[in-house]
Amino acid sequence: MSDPLAAIARFPGVPEAVDEARQAVDRLYRHRVLRRASPAVSTESSLRGARASAAIEGVDVPLDVLRRDEAHDPLVQGALRASAEMGRLGATWRKAPRQVLARLHVVAAAGLTPQEELGRPRAFDEASDPLSLGPAPAAADTAARMEGLLGLLEQPTKAPAIVLAAVVHAELAVLRPFGTADGIVARSAERLTLVEYGLDPKSLVAVEVGHLELAYGDALRAYLSGTPEGVGAWVQHCAAAVSLGVRETTAICEAMQRG
């Protein structure tokens, strides 16, 4: 059986970027604060990740506003709900990814999408485009590519978790299978993949913060080119986002250590 993800993992620059990110995660997991406060660190990381994910979509809310539960924008609320839901979806992600994506959309797009469209693949060709990626693929083409993505998730691969997570993230972000809140769903699915495929089993890494700090839209446009160079650049971007997410979580640990 072919392993297209393993081929992507060998693109120039990808092995080195992935290895650097993995080493960063390994260093984070040795932080002494995590011996006693791992759940608290994960909770804070998830909050910062949700804030960053909403900011990428154009709604930037300060962390202290989120902590006081004073952010009422539906997109921000959707990002927070998706972040909270991930902990309940992990065991299902490998077995029923379609079900998980639908559930993520239900919680992420509530208040943005008519009730009857929540969790359902779009039947129309139009989709929101907050990153100015251009028109989304037609609904029929999107459905076909989604089947291919779900097939990738179901077959074994020798590719590192970062590569799988990067491809899942990019396909959801560029296909926009639901038409609204697809970016929130895409970044949630990436984080879920990093957790469930072993890179970050405690969900500590605020990878969304890394995406916000980097040239996220440009990296997705590189992926859209479909060339080995473009796809490789996207995976390297995702690896760099993991490393920056580790830096963010390390700062959380240091703050807790200081008390």
Ranges and model annotations:
Residues M1-G259:
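FIC/Doc superfamily catalytic core
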